[in-house]
Amino acid sequence: MPAVEIINLTKDYEVGFWRKRKVRALDDLSLSIDEGQIFGFLGANGAGKTTTLKLLMRLIFPTGGSARILGHDIQDVRMHRRIGYLPENPYFYDYLTARELVEYCAELFGLTPVERRKRAADLLARVKLDEKRWDTQLRKFSKGMLQRVGLAQSLVNDPEIVFLDEPMSGLDPVGRREVRDLIASLRDEGKTVFMCSHILSDIEVLCDRVAILKSGRLAQAGYLDELRARPDDPHQMEVMATGVDAATLKQVLTNGQITPTPRGLRIEISAENEIEGVLAALRKTGGKVVSVQPIKQSLEELFMDQ
């Protein structure tokens, strides 16, 4: 059973005052997300990512189509007890402390006072919020600190699936690494994570599958390795070598493009069956092989090509 199943989901907005017109924010989107995966949802500003999340959370309502989460139609309010959600720009009560906010969210899910206190302490520690700030009012928090509190509240009900809209927003490099580790640990626990992010390097490190949205329509979806394969030549390989200079290697190498780099020579070949010729040339010239791997386009290249 898919963790999330989206079928022909469409959302139109009316804009204008005197002369109203419809703008299609999401156009016939269909997706299926397996349980236990980290799924990356990408797109430029205005592509429809946040609209999709708001539709799944029932904060807004679709013009057409349907969706199911954990086997239940999104109209089934009981489903919300099993999910966690961090919006892109969360707003919290300024005069609550971090501890009070998380305990309040736990109370909404029916936890006892003892359970609420323990859950709040466990989660604030898990998101690595400095314990000295647990009883500080949220109005005194930085953007990154508020983001950590938002992550804590999204996990208060021990959800089976977590929806995160720009979870790295406002975090410094150390904070991003800690949140990446947290998200990876959720997958290790068997949870499903649906995350939107503009930070492509984080998506590349974390996600099992991705989808790219363009102007409200699905442009690409699939496993990262499959999407990053070069469409013009999916069998291209890269050999990194040291211990030999480019001029010497060119005298004996009959195929392959040689490029000097700080790490050594980068040799590109267009087919796997050409590797033996490269290895033979390196042995003949005294070179050493550092690595052999397929050449894949980066996620940034894939994103920009859409």
Predicted features and spans:
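Active-site-adjacent beta-strand anchor residues
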Residues: Y95, V239, E268, V292-Q293
